[in-house]
């Protein structure tokens, strides 16, 4: 396992976007091993809200700010389409989020002091493909 050393504190995080990616992140058990706890997910689709998914709750967006403030959540995960990502980012920051793990394929404009890590799945796969081709070409 590749986890960064932590101080044994567990950092709570939330996910916005409870589609396939959001649900996969919500139920992934490996975050606990790295000192992370996903406390809830949020979505605009009321069909998926209020359900229990893998022992975690999917809540309506109107509950996001209260939960973040009450639980002092400082990490937000964005798993929404690109066209919604900036508005979600702004809401997360308004709710006290200080660090964002962004899965939307878009650059987020954030104030100074807010940490953003962009996870570009397409670029990661393209890099892996390129490395495979280089390895294959080197062996022929």
Please name every model-derived segment.
Residues 50-139:
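Phosphate-bearing ligand-interacting subdomains
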Residues 2-4:
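Short, small-residue-biased leader/transition segments that mark boundaries at the very start
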Residues 6-8, 31, 51, 109:
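Generic structural signal for beta-strand residues in well-ordered domains
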Residues 9-45:
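Glycine-rich adenosine-cofactor-binding loop
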Residues 7, 33-35, 70, 94:
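Alpha-helix termination/capping residues and helix-transition junctions
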